[in-house]
């Protein structure tokens, strides 16, 4: 396996907590909820249709494994799994990536609000990686009736590399435990 891993052209190797021969999972720069992570094929391709059958199988096997561990670690009862497959679907980084967002009962009073948050998160992803830890001045959101108030996009600061590396190291421990059981 290559030593450095790239999410498109952005190095993310130190944020990786799970890796197979063909896929990898890493912590999110600007998570919507705690535990929001990304799973990617190691080969950078923009669309699902560009993956080989082996890459596609490995990607979704990895998504399932990461989802199971993330739900356990974050005490979640469900997850949102999301892909923006192409520019017209909202993809801003030209590298297939699957969002896993662990969910708990009543974390949003309107369950579908997570999708608008995902769109906002994805819409700024490339510029966040390009500008490091600069803040993003996003659009104002309409008021919502969420039980858990999600901070406005501009208030969700990108995490530091140190914060993401620490979370990745913590999560790696759970995957080591899972691998020992297999």
From Swiss-Prot:
It is an enzyme of class 3 (hydrolase). The active site is at 97 (tele-amp-histidine intermediate). GO terms for molecular function: bis(5'-nucleosyl)-tetraphosphatase (asymmetrical) activity; GTP binding. Coiled coil: none annotated. Pfam families: HIT. Residues 3-110 form the HIT domain. It catalyses: P(1),P(4)-bis(5'-guanosyl) tetraphosphate + H2O = GMP + GTP + 2 H(+). Substrate binds at residues 28, 84, 90-93, 99. InterPro entries: Bis(5'-adenosyl)-TPase_reg (IPR051884), FHIT (IPR039383), Histidine_triad_CS (IPR019808), Histidine_triad_HIT (IPR001310), HIT-like (IPR011146), HIT-like_sf (IPR036265). GO terms for cellular component: cytosol; mitochondrion; nucleus. A motif (Histidine triad motif) lies at residues 95-99. Residues 150-161 have a biased composition (Basic and acidic residues). Its EC number is 3.6.1.17. Keywords: GTP-binding, Hydrolase, Nucleotide-binding. Signal peptide: none annotated. GO terms for biological process: diadenosine triphosphate catabolic process. It comes from the Eukaryota. Residues 135-161 are annotated as: Disordered. Gene3D superfamilies: HIT-like (3.30.428.10). PANTHER family: BIS(5'-ADENOSYL)-TRIPHOSPHATASE (PTHR46243:SF1). Asymmetrically hydrolyzes Ap4A to yield AMP and ATP. This is Bis(5'-nucleosyl)-tetraphosphatase [asymmetrical]. It comes from Schizosaccharomyces pombe (strain 972 / ATCC 24843).
